[in-house]
């Protein structure tokens, strides 16, 4: 709760090792709050969470080092190069410089390693945050809307990397408001609305249960037209599932 407002209520789920689990819903549904509770940034008023087979409150410092959080909060020196920024994190974990090279290649930023952080584009910064979270080879990785606001090319690169990490055995939690992204990445997902879990399962099972399409015709300035088929957005899908109006 935040004051009298209930942010999340009666949420229960299990996640298998090595799968990508998604939280799907519109703004204000509780996705980010869920990530903050799971990563220890917020404390739940009741119930408990378990990670790495332990109740979260009993995780040791060594356990916490196995949990990666992709965050765009402070922690980078704008005037230092991308390489030197990541090198500082590697030293904190006792990792060699070769690990910095590895993660830079993973996120496709190796050729930009000498750029200062202030000169990176939005997409490059997002991959920089991901590289920081990967330095210590975490067993569990949390991402809050990892491709929000990014161009399709950068989004595709991040999607490909997340699928590679999954194949390597990393368990991944992510939030998204994009059903297409959830379908592409997630083994299972939960649909959230106003703090309630209203649907839970594989993307395929949810799509099969609520199989609706919309055909949209776009007219461009040069008067060319194209027709695209869109799955219902999560906002509409959540509205259908919850039978509640959403402001």
Model-derived segments and spans:
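ABC transporter nucleotide-binding domains
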Residues: 2-193, 199
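ABC transporter nucleotide-binding domain
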Residues: 159-246
């Amino acid at each position: 709760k935040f004051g009298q407002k209930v942010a999340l209520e009666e949420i229960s789920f299990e996640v298998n090792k090595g799968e990508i689990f998604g939280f799907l819903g519109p703004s204000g549904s509780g996705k980010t709050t869920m990530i903050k509770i799971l990563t220890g940034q917020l404390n739940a008023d009741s119930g408990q969470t378990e990670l790495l087979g332990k109740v979260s409150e009993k995780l040791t410092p060594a356990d916490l080092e196995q949990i990666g959080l992709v965050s765009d909060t402070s922690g980078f020196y704008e005037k230092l190069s991308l390489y030197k920024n990541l090198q500082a994190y590697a030293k904190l974990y006792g990792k060699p410089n070769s690990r910095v090279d590895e993660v830079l290649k993973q996120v496709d930023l190796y050729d930009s390693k000498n750029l200062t952080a202030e000169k990176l584009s939005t997409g490059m910064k997002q991959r920089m945050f991901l590289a920081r979270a990967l330095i210590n080879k975490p067993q569990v990785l949390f991402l809050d809307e990892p491709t929000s606001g990014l161009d399709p090319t950068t989004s595709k690169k991040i999607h490909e990397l997340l699928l590679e990490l999954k194949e390597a055995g990393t368990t991944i939690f992510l939030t998204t408001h994009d059903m297409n992204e959830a379908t592409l990445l997630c083994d299972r997902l939960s649909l959230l609305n106003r703090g309630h879990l209203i649907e839970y399962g594989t993307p395929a099972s949810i799509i099969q249960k609520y199989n609706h399409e919309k055909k949209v015709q776009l007219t461009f300035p040069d008067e060319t037209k194209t027709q695209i088929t869109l799955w219902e957005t999560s906002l509409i899908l959540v509205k259908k599932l919850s039978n509640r109006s959403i402001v």
